[in-house]
Curated annotation (Swiss-Prot):
It comes from Pseudomonas aeruginosa (strain ATCC 15692 / DSM 22644 / CIP 104116 / JCM 14847 / LMG 12228 / 1C / PRS 101 / PAO1). The active site is at 16 (proton acceptor), 272. It comes from the Bacteria. Protein-arginine rhamnosyltransferase that catalyzes the transfer of a single rhamnose to elongation factor P (EF-P) on 'Lys-32', a modification required for EF-P-dependent rescue of polyproline stalled ribosomes. Disruption phenotype: Reduced bacterial fitness and reduced pathogenicity. The lineage of its organism: Bacteria, Pseudomonadati, Pseudomonadota, Gammaproteobacteria, Pseudomonadales. The keyword RNA-binding does not apply. One of its GO terms (molecular function) is protein-arginine rhamnosyltransferase activity. Changing residue 16 to N: Abolished protein-arginine rhamnosyltransferase activity. This is Protein-arginine rhamnosyltransferase. The keyword Glycosyltransferase applies.
Length: 376
């Protein structure tokens, strides 16, 4: 059994801590590793893990030792493997502790997920640092070579069983205060602020098929309130506009959010963690990518669309691509959604195929464990 330090700096939203918490749990549960997760904002961690104590300096959850990443840093012995998630800067004293071990620590920089081809030439390459240690860059991805995707053992089978049971879905939705009506399409919305949202909500309002839009607490809630012309929205609120019913859900733990995705006919997601989980749901998805300076995020979006659409029928691929690009550009959804809405059943089959294909590849945690074994 190896020891692991995973450092997470919560820069924005919950994607960084979401990814690192899933990874830490999987390393401990499935690979028997001793994991310490260092978090600089324990309050953010407590949002995705309600069992967590937001003021505790040290706590053990799901076999993971979760520690507050305090400043100034209180030196501790370094682990066999040290992961800096998403280029967060390790404490200088910890880098020194890594170097002074009898066998220096394996230093990994866990990069952001990307479908871009260039990551294949950079994945797992070392970079000699000023302190004398080599840092290896580990890129999660959808093609080889890459670090793969986070996926717990048995995840897809659990999802299939859940989606095959209407009673299991209804019971879960009822625990959130949701009652699905016959013939109602379920859509989840977890996004950044988006000027394209009102146009889409208008189309859902005017559609022939009724929709229930489930909106967990988050940044997009203010945009939804503006469209509804209400001052505020709170958990449990329900508003009806013609064919569209909108219900506000609480911010939920990761496993519950997975089940919400499994219940829905379409999932609008954001960032990285929910993006990957929506793919494992095997359902149509709409990705709101995190905006970066100089529009560099658009290259990542295009790269994923190229890969995701490669096996789709031409008309579905065209409508999907147009809709995604408009959603991320902030408007112009009308024509794309009209075509895409008719293709949702076909898109669902393709989404299941995509999840199955990606599910055949080794997962991120397994690849990290193997990389360490090969490095020794």
């Amino acid at each position: 059994m190896a020891s692991w330090d995973i450092f997470c700096s919560v820069v924005d939203n919950y994607g960084d801590i979401g990814v690192t918490w899933r990874l830490a749990r999987q390393l401990a549960a499935e690979h028997g590793q001793a994991v310490r997760l260092w978090v600089d904002e324990p309050q953010a961690f407590a949002r995705i893990c309600p069992r967590a104590d937001p003021v505790a300096h040290v706590q053990c959850l799901d076999g993971v030792e979760v520690r507050a990443w305090g400043r100034p840093w209180a030196p501790v012995a370094a682990a066999d493997v040290v992961i800096e998630a998403f280029a967060c800067e390790l404490p200088e004293a910890h880098r020194q502790a890594m170097r002074e071990r009898k066998r220096p620590s394996l230093w990994l920089n866990l990069e952001y997920l990307s479908a871009e081809e260039w990551i294949g030439s950079c994945h797992a390459l070392p970079s000699l640092q000023a302190c004398g240690l080599s840092k290896y860059f580990f890129f999660p991805g959808f093609r080889e070579p890459s670090g793969g995707l986070l996926r717990e053992a048995g995840l897809l089978e659990r999802r299939r069983r859940f989606q095959a049971s209407v009673s299991a879905q209804d019971e879960f939705l009822a625990s959130l205060g949701v009652r699905r009506k016959v013939g109602e399409r379920l859509i989840s919305l977890f996004a950044y602020e988006n000027p394209a949202l009102p146009g889409w909500l208008e189309q859902l309002r005017d559609a022939r098929q009724p929709s229930l839009l489930l909106v967990p607490e988050g940044r997009v809630l203010a945009d939804v309130a503006d469209w509804l012309r209400v001052a505020t929205l709170a958990v449990g609120d329900v508003h009806v506009r013609d064919a569209l019913r909108v219900q506000v859900l609480p911010f939920m733990a990761q496993d519950d959010y997975d089940r919400l995705l499994w219940c829905c006919d379409l999932n609008a997601v954001r960032g990285e963690d929910s993006f990957v989980r929506a793919q494992w749901a095997g359902r149509p998805l709409l990705w709101h990518i995190y905006r970066q300076e100089e529009e560099t995020h658009l290259a990542k979006l295009e790269a994923f669309l190229e890969l995701y659409c490669a096996g789709l029928p031409a008309d579905l691929a065209e409508n999907l691509r147009t809709f995604w690009l408009a959603w991320n550009a902030g408007g112009g959804l009308a024509g794309a959604w009209e075509g895409l809405e008719r293709q949702l059943p076909e898109w669902r089959r393709e989404a299941q195929r995509w999840a199955d294909e990606q599910g055949m590849r080794p997962d991120l945690a397994a690849r990290l464990v193997q990389f360490y074994a090969d490095w020794l």
